């Protein structure tokens, strides 16, 4: 691994993500040598807006409300990632003009109550939960995030959401997204340049990256 090669002196530095479970330990063992830098990138899940039930905006809102980003950034990943509720980083040029939604400041208990209400209004119950799959490309960190998200959605909505995980190798995963063969999928974007439109262009109706069909 890169960690072993670095310790042996074969590597001077690496830009590969360290295993989350080793990060804090390595920071203590190698003070001043293990650190992360902020990048113009966002990790997200996209929902297939052309496919039921995600053609219902209230279902999409319920998922947004009941996902605790802080758990993912602080406990699952734990390498300095910042929780956000918008796609464009606020520290990119002109990104400071973008406002986080009001619900991001609400207590999780309140957000969960709102999510449950929206799901019940959409016809879901413990006997008839919202069922869907999260598609992600094969990677241990993606798997850990997906497991955490699935668990939170189920717990925070008191069983109104039931999520399964589906992993595919990179090429198949990309093909599935482009063809719309998914419910929810791991997504994200790395900036091409230091200006907010590099993230906004992702959602243009004629963009090949707009696989969620906004």
Q: Where on the chain are the PLM-derived regions?
A:
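Extracytoplasmic/peripheral linker and loop segments enriched in polar/acidic and small residues
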Residues: 73-74, 106-109, 160-173, 178, ...
